[in-house]
Each structure stands twice: as C-alpha cells, then as structure tokens.
Regions:
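Domain-level signature for soluble enzymes in the chorismate/prephenate branch of the shikimate pathway
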Residues: 1-86
Length: 86
C-alpha cells in the first residue's frame, strides 16, 4: 500500500470512530441524567480502574497498552465533562 491508500484507510476508520463516539456520548449523557436523578457522583474511580484493567487484558497487544489506556482515560474525562453539563 502507498501513503494515500493508507490515509484513506485511516479516514474510513476515523469516520467509524466518529459514529461510535457520538453513540457513546449519547449514552454517557443519559448516564449523567440518571446519576443526577439518583444523587450519584459523576466520577466513579473504581469503575474506571476496572474498565482499564479489563480492556488492558482484552487488547492483546502489549505495545499498544499505554496508548490505549491514555485514549480511554481521555475518553473518560470527556464523558465526565459532558455529564457535568447535563
């Protein structure tokens, strides 16, 4: 594959990730609303740690673990920020 073909492949993946991101943030918004009604805090550190460990084990690529964990942590932060605005 040449550079342009690889970039097109990344573009397709980015489109798929965008759709998944929109779905995830919609669910996150609903979780934020439910937490508000239930009087629960937005932040659940134990759950975040559990997810990080579970995903780390499932990733199957030790080289990518620190990058994927950084990605997830940023995603958690964005979700919490979004929930604060609900």
């Amino acid at each position: 594959m040449n550079l342009n073909e690889l970039r097109k492949e990344i573009d397709v993946i980015d489109e798929q990730m965008m759709e998944l991101f929109k779905k995830r943030m919609s669910v996150s918004k609903n979780i934020g609303k439910l937490k508000k009604v239930m009087g629960l805090p937005i932040i659940d550190n134990a759950r975040e740690e559990m997810i990080l460990e579970k995903r780390k084990a499932a990733l199957g690529n030790d080289e990518l673990i620190p990058y994927y964990q950084a990605f997830l942590i940023k995603l958690f932060d964005l979700s919490k920020e979004y929930q604060h605005h609900v």
